[in-house]
Amino acid sequence: MTIKQGDKVQVIAGSYKGEITEVLKVIRKSNSLILKNINIKNKHVKPKKEGEVGQIKQFEAPIHRSNVMLYDEESQIRSRSKFIISQDGKKVRVLKKLVKN
């Protein structure tokens, strides 16, 4: 998966389409991501002990990685990514729209 924790992404599908946010967590097993302030759900929690009050907790639910694209803030472009080998021999991840073949 080419999207990593801390990357800036743009949501390209769903009710949050067009939103630009940060990746908080990557779930490789299900190919999904948890994004900051995106796909917020409510969970109703029952009281566990006597005298305790029930709660409604909000959490960020995962979104599939096919619904987001990497985003570059400097050029304000979203794009897929690829890996190239730099002149000093390191493997570097770059956006396809920003690099010429």
Swiss-Prot record:
Its main location: plastid. The keyword Ion transport does not apply. This is Large ribosomal subunit protein uL24c. It comes from Guillardia theta. GO terms for biological process: translation. One of two assembly initiator proteins, it binds directly to the 5'-end of the 23S rRNA, where it nucleates assembly of the 50S subunit. It comes from the Eukaryota. Belongs to the universal ribosomal protein uL24 family. Gene3D superfamilies: 2.30.30.30. CDD domains: KOW_RPL26 (cd06089). One of its GO terms (cellular component) is ribosome.
